Amino acid sequence: MSGNNFNASNADTDHLPQVSILAQYIKDLSFENPNAPAVYQWQTQPHIEVQFNIGTQPMAQDVYEVALKVDVSAKADEGVVFHVELVYNGLFAIKNVPADQIQPFLYIEAPRILFPFVRRILADSVRDGNFPPLMLEPIDFAALYMQQTEQQDMLSNTEPAGQA
């Protein structure tokens, strides 16, 4: 076998786009079961409401924090069944990525990477509260991002012009 070296030098890869996950962590988790143990005798099916939010902030040069915030409320005719709040964060290093592609990464790809962990944590928390696991449906982060940017574009186009 010949002694060919297939490793790329640092000079060859320094200009290529690089994205890496530095850390993932629960920043805040709260499970409330305010009507236990009576809630386990209730016969009505609860109505479940899920609210979802994505937040980002720069932490250092080329490092961004992405936060997935999920608020789940389950209510029945008799009262609150359970309430879960989760803030799950990821730290991402983004290097040599064009500026116009950073925001789409932070609002589409980063949440897509974090979502399976959020889903599992919520399912486990609800199950540990003695309820059937809550399995969130997959979320199309690209569609949400496009919808949000379209709404922002429409708002910026309808704002009255400044006075001269």
Curated annotation (Swiss-Prot):
Q: Does the keyword ATP-binding apply?
A: no
Q: Which GO terms describe its cellular component?
A: cytoplasm
The GO molecular function terms of this record are: unfolded protein binding
Task: Give UniProt keywords alphabetically.
Answer: Chaperone, Cytoplasm, Protein transport, Translocation, Transport
Pfam families reported in the protein's UniProt record: SecB (PF02556)
What InterPro entries would the database entry show?
Answer: SecB, SecB-like_sf
Name the principal localization, coarsely classed. Answer: cytoplasm
PANTHER family per record: PROTEIN-EXPORT PROTEIN SECB (PTHR36918:SF1), PTHR36918
Q: What is this protein called?
A: Protein-export protein SecB
Q: Which gene encodes it?
A: secB
